[in-house]
Amino acid sequence: MIIQDVELVKVARTPGDYPPPLKGEVAFVGRSNVGKSSLLNALFNKKIAFVSKTPGKTRSINFYLVNSKYYFVDLPGYGYAKVSKKERMLWKRLVEDYFKNRWSLQMVFLLVDGRIPPQDSDFMMIEWMKSLNIPFTIVLTKMDKVKMSERAKKLEEHQKEFSRYGEYTIIPTSSVTGEGISELLDLISTLLKEN
């Protein structure tokens, strides 16, 4: 997929804020500070998604219109302890409504920090998506920060951890070096063309 144009068209804080569904869309979810915005900017080859060093900055569902026909959707991060319980529940309801009611959703990309073992919150997200029959692909982020001598071991550890849920594609990426970006775009292109 070649991304020719991208525009942030909607910042949704309630389900009523969602734009009408298009032919297809993909969503990106992960723990706070996993690198969602940086990965989106790498996919877009443009700095459009706000990047912050402070966890929990994405507090809405952000819809990016790509090539005037598809949505790339940035979901709020999970697992950030300093956010109030009330706000976490609001995010959970917002994301749950999105998962249940967006018929145009083709795939969720679950972003996991490749430097560390998957966290309990990552497993909870997988179980939640599986319970809702949401298709997903696992994307390891920040792989540029993993020493070359440790990469094979880290990938193997992640594959072993996630294998309890079945066989899933795992794509190692880096928004800094561009690793995995074209592979991810190719997968997205295939998904959106099929539907």
Swiss-Prot record:
Pfam families: MMR_HSR1. GTP binds at residues 30-37, 56-60, 74-77, 141-144, 173-175. InterPro entries: G_ENGB_dom, GTP-bd, GTP-bd_ribosome_bio_YsxC, P-loop_NTPase, Small_GTP-bd. One of its GO terms (molecular function) is metal ion binding. Its cofactor is Mg(2+). Belongs to the TRAFAC class TrmE-Era-EngA-EngB-Septin-like GTPase superfamily. EngB GTPase family. This is Probable GTP-binding protein EngB. It comes from Thermotoga petrophila (strain ATCC BAA-488 / DSM 13995 / JCM 10881 / RKU-1).
